[in-house]
Design a protein with these regions (language model features):
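A conserved beta-strand-loop-helix scaffold within acyl/acetyltransferase catalytic domains
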Residues: 23-34, 40-52, 107-108
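Short, hydrophobic beta-strand segments that form beta-sheet elements in well-ordered domains
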Residues: 35-38, 87-89
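Conserved acetyl-CoA-binding loop-helix of GNAT-fold acetyltransferases
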Residues: 63-80, 101
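Conserved GNAT acetyl-CoA-binding A-motif
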Residues: 80-91
Length: 125
């Protein structure tokens, strides 16, 4: 199993400085505004929102099939922790189809996020 730092480093790759991402995750956990769920080499960073809602961000160093298996376990843990609604954003609607095989159905709709529109997927419990 890889270290948390190695997972973030591999997931962030050349798109940014993995150290900055790691520091942000660590700081938000200490502030009690976020949680991290991990299974295998997949991390789900969860922002705690009002009304038992959460926004999730996924980092993985697993191969595709194993990443989906581990993501499914993380999602089960998030729901078991008492979150009633989970949000996550993607640049296009087809991005949510990868969740269907692991039994995680979502509703999606356009959402204005800052200066650009994205699709927001929502899972209600």
């Amino acid at each position: 199993m890889k270290s948390t730092q190695d997972i973030i480093k591999e997931a962030v790759g050349k798109r940014g400085k993995w150290q900055d991402v790691y520091k942000a995750i660590y700081a938000t956990i200490k502030l009690n505004t976020h949680r991290v769920f991990r299974h295998g080499n997949t991390l789900v960073w969860v922002k705690i929102l009002p009304d038992q809602a959460a926004q999730m961000f996924v980092f993985t160093a697993d191969k595709a099939g194993k990443a989906m298996e581990n993501l499914a376990e993380c999602l089960k843990a998030i729901l078991a922790a008492g979150f009633k609604q989970i949000y996550f954003d993607a640049p296009y609607e087809d991005a949510f189809e990868f969740l269907e095989p692991i039994g995680f159905q979502v509703d999606s709709a356009p959402y204005q996020n800052g200066y650009r529109g994205v699709i927001r997927g929502t899972r209600e419990v």
